[in-house]
Amino acid sequence: MEQLLHYVWKHKIFPLKELKTTTGQQVEVIDTGLANTDAGPDFFNAKLKLDGVLWIGNIEIHERSSDWFKHGHHADTGYNSVILHIASEIDTEISRSNGERIPQIQLICPEAVRTNYKELLETDSYPPCYRIIPSLPPFTAHSWMTALQMERFEQKATLLNERLKRCQGNWEDAFFITLARNFGFGLNGDAFETWAHRLPFRAVDKHRNDLFQIEAIFFGQAGILEDSDGDGYYLRLKKEYTYLQHKFGLIPMDASLWRFLRLRPANFPHIRIAQLACLYHRAYGLLSRIMETETLQGVRDILKGGTSEYWLTHYTFGGSSPSRPKTLSNTSLDLLIINTVVTFLYAYGLHKGNRVLCARAGSFLEELKAENNYITRMWEQYGMKASNAADSQALIQLKKEYCDKKKCLYCRIGYEYLKRK
């Protein structure tokens, strides 16, 4: 329960006036310090008074005071800056590496906090804090949602930077790979990212003006042109791919990675690849164009896309279907903007120190409708309704990074739950 002690100390959930060290010194807590998530003492730069004398330094917390020795802190000069040791059980005196004794206090977690925390960890309901959500103070709910939105921005930007490294810092390539992944709309996301990493962009660019050749490379690298039989269009693509494959030394991915189960025909990989081919063909400098587009509708117009004529009457190679345009629905477009465009606006804005792009990312989310998925529906059921995409992104972050990981101690709703009497 050491984590819980950290929590009790950080939020001062203890009787401040009755705090004394094991040797009887009166303790006045001015500042509990900054929580440390890396190696070293648990809290940095705490301020407190011991019998009226001001001390500024670090705090270390353990279940038992003997853990100080168990963890080797007595021999580590990095812990000589500790001015107060906190433990729920005092079973020994402790000292710095030079032999100086360190003041200690026994901190008992309040029974109500312990009981509430146990409820959060052990309840079968999801989320476990559902009882108090309707009664959350409006300011608490609003400020927490805002913080979660920024946290999600930062998390996505970090993941994007990792992808950017794989692309040798090429933002256009990283953008298309991210866009391709999100064209998988969950089920085929991994397959689309694998496929996109197989695309030789510099080679493809040489044939960008020819949609047929782009399709040949795109479908060929997806492993979808491996069969020897097919209709006329399929065989023409296969022949073209064979030539380009030899020319550029292309190696296709394993076609078994593509998933079709429970997919509507409009979501089949064939259609999504055809749409991406058309987009790549007509939108040179795709990321640059999007960065220069100031309106949400303008971004939608760029991404809306379409397909070559063959796909108007087909969902896969072979059997035909009634003719209909294969453009992205508004819902699909908005998801691509949320998960790709907004992320790049924010990350690229940070990279270039361009606050306008960062602000545009936020305004796009506020303008877009809230996502409608099982996560947002769950929160709405318990009283947290998303009014726009910024809210829905915050609620997704809350579930994935706090509820699923049982990080109730780091959640502001968890805080409200724990401090109940």
Kindly give the residue locations of the regions a language model identified.
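N-terminal ordered "arm"
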Residues: Y7-S66
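Short, structured segments at the rim of ligand-binding sites
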Residues: A39, D76, C411
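Short loop/turn segments at secondary-structure transitions that flank enzyme active sites
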Residues: S65-D67, E89-T92, E111-V113, F185, ...
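Hydrophobic, aromatic-lined core segments that form the binding pocket/scaffold
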Residues: L148-A394, K407
